[in-house]
Amino acid sequence: MFFPTLLAVEAAEKGGLFDLDATLPLIAIQFLLLVAVLNSLFYEPVTRAIDSRNDYIRTTQAEAQERLDKAVSLTRQYESEISQARLQAQQVIAEAEAAAARIRSEKLAAVQAEIQQKLEAARLQVEQEKQAALEQLQQQVDAIAAQITQKLLGSAR
């Protein structure tokens, strides 16, 4: 507290605010020494630490960007592979459905042909039985007609 007033009293005694004596260059030299000491002891280590931290951040950020790019690339590749697999699965399903439809139609055609064959065989059998029955009936009619004729001729005689 007394120090500023003492300076003011000294300045008033000498006659001016600034006297050009050895104190100004001494203060300038002290200031330059302080700057040099602070520069070597504080600013350079802090600057090196900041620079190394910035380098670390830059390299980490570059690595992260590379990993992100790789992840995006792998995602696209996997999505492409998945879509190709889905297309292949759809093709396999379509082929299986077509094969099943073809097998079903072949079996249906075979069954229909077998049924048609059996129907034709049954129709032929019925036709043969009908012909046999008609022949037997004709024989019976002929026999009855012969008996009737004999009775008529026998009674007419």
Curated annotation (Swiss-Prot):
Compartment(s): Cellular thylakoid membrane
Matches recorded under InterPro entries: ATP_synth_b (IPR034679), ATP_synth_b/b'su_bac/chlpt (IPR002146), ATP_synthase_B_chain (IPR050059)
GO molecular-function terms, A-Z: proton-transporting ATP synthase activity, rotational mechanism; proton-transporting ATPase activity, rotational mechanism
Segments traversing the membrane: 22-42
Topology relative to the membrane: Single-pass membrane protein
Keywords, comma-separated and alphabetical: ATP synthesis, CF(0), Hydrogen ion transport, Ion transport, Membrane, Thylakoid, Transmembrane, Transmembrane helix, Transport
Gene Ontology, cellular component aspect: plasma membrane-derived thylakoid membrane; proton-transporting ATP synthase complex
Similarity field: Belongs to the ATPase B chain family.
Entry function: F(1)F(0) ATP synthase produces ATP from ADP in the presence of a proton or sodium gradient. F-type ATPases consist of two structural domains, F(1) containing the extramembraneous catalytic core and F(0) containing the membrane proton channel, linked together by a central stalk and a peripheral stalk. During catalysis, ATP synthesis in the catalytic domain of F(1) is coupled via a rotary mechanism of the central stalk subunits to proton translocation.
NCBIfam families in UniProt: PRK07353.1 (NF005607)
SUBUNIT field: F-type ATPases have 2 components, F(1) - the catalytic core - and F(0) - the membrane proton channel. F(1) has five subunits: alpha(3), beta(3), gamma(1), delta(1), epsilon(1). F(0) has four main subunits: a(1), b(1), b'(1) and c(10-14). The alpha and beta chains form an alternating ring which encloses part of the gamma chain. F(1) is attached to F(0) by a central stalk formed by the gamma and epsilon chains, while a peripheral stalk is formed by the delta, b and b' chains.
Protein name: ATP synthase subunit b'
Protein's organism: Synechococcus sp. (strain JA-2-3B'a(2-13))
Gene: atpF2
